[in-house]
């Protein structure tokens, strides 16, 4: 009893193993070519290998009555070249028309490039969507009336491919993006093809016999003339298909054809170099064995077996056998064979698969060869290679679109950030770099004749002459040619506001001057004066705008006059521009203009003396630091609008004079 129960448990725990892989003995082999040739004819054009692996099209070649054999109809109605259906969609529907391109990165699908277009088909509005992934291109046309609400870009992408899982798409801002996209889409379209042509004589059943044939029968010569034109390879200018057109190492002539703007070069076995003593004829197999599709021409009734030729590339064969057709021309029987993983390709063969020589058959045969190569690309071996190539090209396209779009927005990479200090590229940063280099060169020229005593400014734009350490540090920085003191930004809009006010000219306010030195103008009291520049004047400086902390100073501190400043008696004088804002009750910014002695505002060229850069150079004269006086009464000394406050700078002509307040 126990043994019986244990036995049943053992049976329940047993599982069935998968059937073992079939060996050659398990297959029902097809008859070999030698067995078939031992029988009575006629023989088929193609025999499947003993253990399969290929499919055949066109097995019926019985001609009951010759007059009933009809030639193929016009190729424009039934003969069509097959290619990737989505390869030309962008050129046809998007290129040169209003549309939008986006890019993104999906964790599962990889790089994505998305194109969308509003389209009107008939009287109905549609969205035409084209999504490119590393595996394929998805295309769909969706009526807007079928949507409950107008979708965003991510939702549109999910409409055409449900596997999309991204948070957002980034717009493409590069003007030449359409060229890059159409090049990627059409990389699968080829206008150059190379096909092998193998001549099989009666009784030839091996690769060595096929490649050892040198002579050409009249029927084979006629077929080659029908297939294309004979060309000399020396200095041939068309598509050469890997043949040597310079040194003649691959023969002297070949067969070439231009069909529907597609160049075709045929590798004819009898025209390739023949090597004595080489049973394999590697010079011939090197070219034909690397082709994907080959034509096998049979003079007489001898079957062709696809595995006769050992090749990893040859995936499809079109076998043509000549048949006497009387005065109307020869007849050609056609059969097609390809590996199992190659999908069926058109145009389909008629029944019976017999053609009369003529332009219709040439159209059919060349179309069949081109479509065969496109179909072979879908085989497992070529599909993996195509997928890797497509993924690499899509990644390159993604990076190009991303880099150029960032550049158009002025957002550079890490290298640009290190070079520019604050980062960023584009037009504005390029312009700033040009002005900065000009300011540094002018700084070096102006400081060559100056004393090391310099004026240091704080980040708020106010002078700090009583701080010897800070003044010393600023002086050292200014003494070195080509260097400028670095200052922190006063705020996010500091430099922009300086540019808006027009801090381009050096301004000085003098209320009272008893004995002005020779060579200097004495402006009218109460007006902002602009002193003419000398040849050795240093570069004008533009201190940053004051921060909020400095704006809340007490009224008493604003009216203090910093004493102890003197002016150099040198005729070659330089100027220091100091700008401060007097903020009103409502906090509005006040624009200041440079006013001449007659009260007429001066127009200034912001491109010539622009100092709104974030890291603008600050240079001053060789004298001591002047004092800054803020007028407590905005209407004093101002000839214009009394609502606008005025900034005045008190300067002394010599050390003996005491500064006066500009009240």
Swiss-Prot record:
GO terms for molecular function: GTPase activator activity; protein homodimerization activity; small GTPase binding. Residues 1-23, 442-646 are annotated as: Disordered. Keywords: Golgi apparatus, GTPase activation, Membrane, Phosphoprotein. Pfam families: GoLoco (PF02188), Rap-GAP_dimer (PF21022), Rap_GAP (PF02145). It is found in: Golgi apparatus membrane. One of its GO terms (cellular component) is Golgi membrane. The keyword Membrane applies. Detected in brain cortex and striatum (at protein level). Detected in brain cortex and striatum. Residues 1-17 form the GoLoco domain. Residues 580-591 have a biased composition (Acidic residues). Residues 450-467, 535-549 have a biased composition (Polar residues). Residues 566-577, 616-631 have a biased composition (Low complexity). PROSITE patterns: GOLOCO, RAPGAP. One of its GO terms (biological process) is negative regulation of thyroid gland epithelial cell proliferation. SUPFAM superfamilies: Rap/Ran-GAP. Residues 181-397 form the Rap-GAP domain. The modification Phosphoserine is found at residues 441, 484, 499, 515, 541-542. The keyword Phosphoprotein applies. InterPro entries: GoLoco_motif, Rap/Ran-GAP_sf, Rap/Ran_GAP_dom, Rap1_Ran_GAP. PANTHER family: RAP GTPASE-ACTIVATING PROTEIN, RAP1 GTPASE-ACTIVATING PROTEIN 1. GTPase activator for the nuclear Ras-related regulatory protein RAP-1A (KREV-1), converting it to the putatively inactive GDP-bound state. Homodimer and heterodimer with RAP1B. This is Rap1 GTPase-activating protein 1. It comes from Mus musculus (Mouse). The lineage of its organism: Eukaryota, Metazoa, Chordata, Craniata, Vertebrata.
């Amino acid at each position: 009893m126990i043994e019986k129960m244990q036995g049943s448990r053992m049976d329940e725990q047993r599982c069935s193993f998968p059937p073992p892989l079939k060996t050659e003995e398990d297959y029902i082999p097809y008859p070999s070519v030698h067995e078939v040739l031992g029988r009575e004819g006629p023989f088929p054009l193609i025999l499947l290998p003993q253990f399969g692996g290929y499919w055949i099209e066109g097995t019926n070649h019985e001609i009951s009555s010759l007059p009933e054999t009809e030639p193929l109809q016009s190729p424009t109605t039934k003969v069509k070249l097959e290619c990737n259906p989505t390869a030309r969609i962008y050129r046809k529907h998007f290129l040169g028309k209003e549309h939008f391109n986006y890019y993104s990165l999906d964790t599962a699908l990889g790089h994505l490039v998305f194109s969308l277009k509003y389209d009107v088909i008939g009287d109905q509005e549609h969205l035409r969507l084209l999504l490119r992934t590393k595996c394929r291109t998805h295309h769909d046309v969706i009526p807007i009336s079928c949507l409950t609400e107008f979708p965003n870009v991510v939702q549109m992408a999910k409409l055409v491919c449900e596997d999309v899982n991204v948070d957002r798409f980034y717009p493409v801002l590069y003007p030449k993006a359409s060229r890059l996209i159409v090049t990627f889409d059409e990389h699968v379209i080829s206008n150059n093809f190379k096909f092998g042509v193998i001549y099989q004589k009666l009784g030839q059943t091996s690769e060595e016999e096929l490649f050892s044939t040198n002579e050409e029968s009249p029927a084979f010569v006629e077929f080659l003339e029908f297939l294309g034109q004979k060309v000399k390879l020396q200095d041939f200018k068309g598509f050469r298909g890997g043949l040597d057109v310079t040194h003649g190492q691959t023969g002297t002539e070949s067969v070439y054809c231009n069909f529907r703007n597609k160049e075709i070069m045929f590798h004819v076995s009898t025209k390739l170099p023949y090597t004595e003593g080489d049973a394999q004829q590697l010079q011939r197999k090197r070219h034909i064995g690397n082709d994907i599709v080959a034509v096998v021409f049979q003079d007489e009734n001898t079957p062709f077996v696809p595995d006769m030729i050992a090749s990893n590339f040859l995936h499809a064969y079109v076998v043509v056998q000549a048949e006497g057709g009387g005065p109307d021309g020869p007849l050609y029987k056609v059969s097609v064979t390809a590996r199992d993983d190659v999908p069926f390709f058109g145009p389909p063969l008629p029944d019976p698969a017999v053609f009369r020589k003529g332009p219709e058959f040439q159209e059919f045969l060349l179309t069949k060869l081109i479509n065969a190569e496109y179909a072979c690309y879908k085989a497992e071996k070529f599909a993996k290679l195509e997928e890797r190539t497509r993924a690499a090209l899509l990644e390159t396209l993604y990076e190009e679109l991303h880099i150029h779009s960032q550049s158009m927005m002025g957002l550079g990479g890490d290298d640009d950030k290190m070079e520019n200090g604050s980062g960023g590229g584009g037009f504005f940063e390029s312009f700033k770099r040009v002005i900065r280099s000009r300011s540094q060169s002018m700084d070096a020229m102006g400081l060559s004749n100056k004393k090391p005593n310099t004026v240091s400014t704080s980040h708020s734009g106010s002078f700090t002459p009583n701080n010897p350490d800070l003044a010393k540090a600023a002086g050292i920085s200014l003494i070195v040619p080509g260097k400028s003191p670095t200052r922190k930004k006063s705020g996010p809009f500091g430099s922009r506001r300086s540019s808006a006010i027009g801090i381009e000219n050096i301004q000085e306010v003098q209320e009272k001057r008893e004995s002005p030195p020779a060579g200097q103008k004495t402006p009218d009291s109460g007006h902002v004066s602009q002193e003419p520049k000398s040849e050795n004047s240093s570069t004008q400086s533009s201190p940053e705008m004051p921060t909020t902390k400095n704006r809340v100073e007490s009224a008493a501190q604003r009216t203090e006059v910093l004493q102890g400043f003197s002016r150099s008696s040198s005729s070659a004088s330089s100027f220091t521009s100091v700008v401060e804002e007097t903020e009103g009750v409502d906090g509005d910014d006040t624009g200041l203009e440079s006013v001449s002695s007659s009260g007429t505002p001066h127009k200034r060229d912001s491109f010539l003396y622009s100092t709104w850069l974030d890291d603008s150079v600050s240079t001053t004269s060789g004298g001591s630091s002047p004092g800054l006086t803020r007028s407590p009464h905005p209407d004093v000394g101002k000839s214009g609008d009394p609502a606008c406050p005025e900034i005045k700078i008190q300067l002394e002509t010599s050390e003996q004079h005491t500064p006066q307040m500009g009240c």
